[in-house]
Amino acid sequence: SRKQKFDKKFIKLVIVVDHSMVXKXNNDLIAI
């Protein structure tokens, strides 16, 4: 479905943003 595709893109975006904030030790989003 369209929503699932959007969710996957959003999750990828969140992971990319999270990686850019590794300095803050913000790794909980990757663990989900």
UniProtKB/Swiss-Prot annotation:
GO molecular function, one term: metallopeptidase activity
Record localization: Secreted
Record key words, sorted: Blood coagulation cascade activating toxin, Calcium, Disulfide bond, Hemostasis impairing toxin, Hydrolase, Metal-binding, Metalloprotease, Protease, Prothrombin activator, Secreted, Toxin, Zinc
GO biological process: proteolysis
Function of the molecule: Calcium-dependent prothrombin (F2) activator. This protein may activate prothrombin via recognition by the regulatory subunit of the calcium ion bound conformation of its gamma-carboxyglutamic acid (GLA) domain, and the subsequent conversion of prothrombin to active thrombin is catalyzed by the catalytic subunit.
Assembly and oligomerization: Heterodimer of a metalloproteinase subunit and a regulatory subunit comprising two disulfide-linked lectins (14 kDa and 17 kDa chains) (AC Q9PRP7 and AC Q9PRP8).
The name this protein goes by in its record: Zinc metalloproteinase carinactivase-1 catalytic subunit
Species for this entry: Echis carinatus
